[in-house]
């Protein structure tokens, strides 16, 4: 048979499948192009959570996990499960890099500053990791303060008080919460440095809104209409900022939303905003490696495993050309995460990153930059690349706002783009897999509370093959099966490291 060219992978980020109509943006939206694909093309479903993507049972998937598994073509054991197991087996406190952090602070006489998301969402961090780290340090008589990042995005929008109750009941005597900051400020990934600056000032200099306690900070925020995600950086009690010889440990294990705040705290060449005189840190550490640049000034408790012969690497080894495309909110996912944690592009790999719109929240502009992404997608098809990987951010990013009407508009914007892409693909004689990395906007109303649902879901996601061989059918599978399927469409054998199986029969 004639091999299609290009072969494209189109990831509709956060587009899950559910038969429940209430709050189901993809089902309620007007999406004629996606409807046509589901009616006329081979399709099935993929599992994007739990052990099928290297996470603990019942743990929802996310974009980092999803794109890592997609690119690897195998199930990749993720940081959450690795850290959970170490805590369960009593090995967390014995970690050699944590021990080195402890010894350094014993020598310097400084305080350990622990920063991380305080929830059990498990997407960027976990409250249990905060508790384990605080205990490990306090057991060695290291003074500990906590910089709590409230979630409200991967968990219910107003759930922080319960998490603080859990945290404070488990913390050793003497460990204090020094600041409370909504993740909107401290966990930005789109160069919104005005937000990051406010988080930095509270955490490092002790400057910001004041409250007597964590619960007071939350009550104060709710009184001003701020949900957990948006709590203004708040300084508690008598905290006056970090000092020379202190140490800083970021407990978030996901890289993309830890990079900016940690660069502000520790990068010697940081210039994005005026930090003032920073403390002379005795030690800086992250739960995971946030980037190769970060590794120049901070250590890593759990270094990333090497993932060889990823989809992009394997295609490059065959001398073929590939193209990666996403707006800034999802750009790391189709590059860094899809490439198994490699920052540098492979030979023959071109990239484009349209800027995400400069709005406070994406329900205000649910189309985001989908038109620019579609324009570039169509141009890449016409350019003659062998492989194109594209992420549409809208269903996920707007899904996180909890606004059903906006999420429907997001799905419709993506579907309109899909129509243009399909026309260009048919003209070029290409093939395409349309899928998602996890669910999100398929549940916009919490079935238990009736309030907004802002987190990812445990629903399956669609997988559709456009331009499949005649008579082809698809089986249900998992994200690790996508790379072998793409390589099959390209007429390439899979490398032996890819244990995923082709979905086409």
From Swiss-Prot:
Belongs to the BPG-independent phosphoglycerate mutase family. It is an enzyme of class 5 (isomerase). Substrate binds at residues 124, 153-154, 183, 189, 254-257, 330. It comes from the Bacteria. Pathway: Carbohydrate degradation; glycolysis; pyruvate from D-glyceraldehyde 3-phosphate: step 3/5. Its cofactor is Mn(2+). HAMAP family: GpmI. Binds 2 manganese ions per subunit. This is 2,3-bisphosphoglycerate-independent phosphoglycerate mutase. The lineage of its organism: Bacteria, Pseudomonadati, Pseudomonadota, Alphaproteobacteria, Rhodobacterales. It comes from Roseobacter denitrificans (strain ATCC 33942 / OCh 114) (Erythrobacter sp. (strain OCh 114)). It holds the Pfam family Metalloenzyme. Its EC number is 5.4.2.12. Monomer. Mn(2+) 2 binds at residues 13, 63, 437-438. GO terms for biological process: glucose catabolic process; glycolytic process. Keywords: Glycolysis, Isomerase, Manganese, Metal-binding. SUPFAM superfamilies: 2,3-Bisphosphoglycerate-independent phosphoglycerate mutase, substrate-binding domain, Alkaline phosphatase-like. Catalyzes the interconversion of 2-phosphoglycerate and 3-phosphoglycerate. One of its GO terms (cellular component) is cytosol. GO terms for molecular function: manganese ion binding; phosphoglycerate mutase activity.
């Amino acid at each position: 048979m004639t091999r299609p060219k290009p072969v494209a992978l189109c990831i509709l980020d956060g587009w899950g499948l559910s038969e429940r109509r209430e709050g189901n943006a993809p089902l309620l939206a007007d999406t004629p192009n996606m409807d046509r694909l589901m009616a006329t093309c081979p399709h099935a479903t993929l599992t994007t959570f739990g052990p099928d993507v290297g996470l603990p049972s019942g743990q929802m998937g996310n974009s980092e996990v999803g794109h890592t598994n997609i690119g690897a073509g195998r199930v990749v054991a993720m940081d959450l499960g690795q850290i959970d197991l170490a805590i369960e087996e009593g090995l967390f406190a014995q970690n050699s890099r944590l021990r080195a952090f402890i010894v350094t602070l014993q020598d310097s006489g400084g305080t350990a500053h622990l920063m991380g998301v305080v929830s059990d969402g498990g997407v960027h961090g976990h409250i249990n990791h905060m508790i384990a780290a605080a205990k490990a340090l306090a057991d060695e008589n290291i003074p500990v303060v906590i910089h709590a990042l409230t979630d409200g995005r991967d968990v219910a929008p107003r759930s922080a008080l319960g998490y603080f109750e859990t945290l404070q009941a488990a913390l050793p005597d003497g460990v204090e919460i020094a600041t409370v900051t909504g993740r909107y400020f401290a966990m930005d990934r789109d160069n919104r440095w005005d937000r990051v600056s406010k988080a930095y000032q509270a955490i490092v200099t002790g400057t910001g809104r004041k409250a007597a306690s964590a619960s007071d900070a939350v009550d104060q925020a709710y009184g001003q209409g701020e949900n957990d995600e948006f709590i203004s950086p708040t300084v508690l009690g008598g905290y006056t900022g970090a000092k020379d010889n202190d140490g800083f440990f970021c407990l978030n294990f996901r890289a993309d939303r830890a990079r900016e705040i940690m660069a502000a705290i520790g990068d010697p060449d940081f210039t994005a905003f005026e930090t003032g005189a920073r403390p002379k840190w005795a030690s800086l550490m992250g739960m995971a490696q946030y980037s190769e640049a970060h590794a120049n000034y901070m250590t890593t408790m759990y270094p990333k495993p090497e993932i060889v012969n990823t989809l992009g690497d394997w295609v490059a080894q065959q001398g073929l050309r590939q193209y990666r495309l996403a707006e800034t909110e999802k750009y790391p996912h189709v590059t860094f995460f899809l490439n198994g944690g490699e920052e540098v592009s492979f030979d023959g790999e071109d990239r484009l990153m349209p800027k995400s719109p400069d709005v406070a929240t994406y329900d205000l502009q649910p189309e985001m930059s989908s038109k620019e992404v579609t324009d570039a997608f169509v141009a890449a098809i016409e350019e003659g690349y062998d492989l194109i990987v594209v992420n549409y951010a809208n269903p996920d990013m707007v899904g996180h706002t909890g606004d059903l009407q906006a999420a429907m508009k997001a799905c419709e914007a993506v579907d309109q783009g899909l129509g243009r892409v399909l026309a260009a693909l048919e003209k070029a004689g290409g093939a395409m897999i349309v899928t998602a990395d996890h669910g999100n906007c398929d549940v916009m109303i919490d079935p238990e509370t009736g309030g907004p649902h802002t987190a990812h879901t445990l629903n399956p996601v669609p997988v559709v093959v456009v331009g499949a061989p005649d008579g082809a059918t698809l089986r249900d599978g998992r994200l690790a099966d996508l790379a072998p399927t793409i390589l099959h469409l390209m007429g390439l054998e899979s490398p032996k490291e890819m244990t995923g199986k082709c979905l086409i029969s």
